[in-house]
Amino acid sequence: MHLYFYCLILLFVPGGNSLGINSYLKHMSNKPQDHVNRTKTVDSKDLAALPLSSYMLNLYQSFHHSELNHGTEGAPSLPSNHRADIIRSLAAKSFDHGGSRWTLVFDFSSLSQEEEHQLAEVRFDFRAFEGAISAEMEVMVDFLHQSSSCQSISGWCQSYLYVGSLTGTLRSRSSDTWVTFEATDIIHKWFERNEKGKSRYEDREKQLKKLPRAKSAERRYQQQNTEDQQIVMMVYSNISKKERLSGTATLLQDAAHSKYLVVMPGIQTIAHTRRHRRSHIFKEHVMGMKHVPPADSSRTLCRRVDFFVDFKQIGWDSWIIHPMKYNAYRCEGECPSPVNESVKPNNHAYMQSLLNYYVKGKAPEVCCVPIRMSSLSMVYYDHDDIAFQNHEGMIVEECGCQ
C-alpha cells in the first residue's frame, strides 16, 4: 500500500517541486492529527461555514464610515499603494508546514480571468503560528488547488492540483497581527494553466484515499478557527476596461453569478444551473419583481425622496453579508415646462424642454432622474469565498430634470 501511494505522488507533481508536496501528502496519510483541513460542502443553508475574517470586516467598516461622512470616493487601497475595485478573501482549505516549507491548499475557482489582477498575498495569523513563523523569515510555499465542487459522500475530497511554488520573505506591518507573503505569480500561473488547457495537467490530479480519522481532524480545525481564518489569500483586482466602458451594473453581475441567490416565489428556475446560464435566470427574477409605486404628489417639483432597500425582501440576504439594509433614495416629482435652474437641467434637457414648450409633441418631456450618484461598499459571498467591492451608482445623491 505504501509503495503504491508513493508512486502516485511521483505522478502527481513532476520535477524538483515534488519533494515538499510529497511530504505533505505522505504526512496527510500518516499523521492526520497534525494536518488541518476544512473541506466541506457549503450551501446557502450553512453560510456560517464561511466566517467573515476580521480583515474583511475592518475593510468594510472603514469604507462604510467614509461613506457616512461623505469621504472621498474611491476603490480600496492595496498594501503597495495601488488601487483595486474588488478584494477577494480565499481561506486556505488545508495546510501543512515543516520548518520553512509550507504547503497551502486553496480553491481558485472563483477568480475571474476577465479581471485585472493587481496583487495577491497570503496572510498568516501570527497568533496561531507563533514560534513557527516570524517577520523577515525566508519560506518556500507550495500551492495546490482543490475545488469545492469536489465532494465525497462524507463531504471530504482528496483531489488536488499542483499550481506552483514560490520562495520569498514573510513581511509584517505595524500594529498588525498578520505576516504576509506575496503570491501574485501564483494567480498568473493559475490562469496560464487554464489558457494552455486542462488536458495537459490531468496527470497531476489524482484521487487520494480517504484520510484516516478525518472527523477528528475536522473537529480540531474548528476548535482552532473559532474567531478567524488562520491563513487567507487576499486577491486584489480591477474590473476590465471593457466592462468599465460598457457601463453594466456590477451588482447585477455579482448577483447573477451568486450560487447563494434565493429566487423568490413565482419565479421559475432550473436546479443545478451552470454559471453561464445564471445571468438569464437572474434577468427573469428582476423582471418578476414589482416596481415600487411613486408617492402621491400634486405637482410637486422634482426632488430626492427616501427609498429604503431591504435585501431580505428580494431574497438577497442569502449572499449579501453587509449591509443588509440601506437608503438608496430615488427621484420623484414633476419637471416644469420649460425647465429652469432649480431642477438642474443640462443644456440638452433645456433645449428639449424649450422646443417642446413652443412646439408640442416635438420631443418627449424631460424626466425627473438621478443626476449624481454615489457608491456603496458591500461584503458578500462569492462562490465559496468572501469578497469586498465598492459598487458605484448605488445611492442617489441629487435629482434633476433631464
From Swiss-Prot:
Homodimer; disulfide-linked. Glycans are attached at N37, N238, N340. GO terms for biological process: dorsal/ventral axis specification. Belongs to the TGF-beta family. This is Nodal homolog 4-A. Keywords: Cleavage on pair of basic residues, Developmental protein, Disulfide bond, Glycoprotein, Growth factor, Secreted, Signal. It comes from Xenopus laevis (African clawed frog). The keyword Transferase does not apply. InterPro entries: Cystine-knot_cytokine, TGF-b_C, TGF-beta-rel, TGFb_CS.
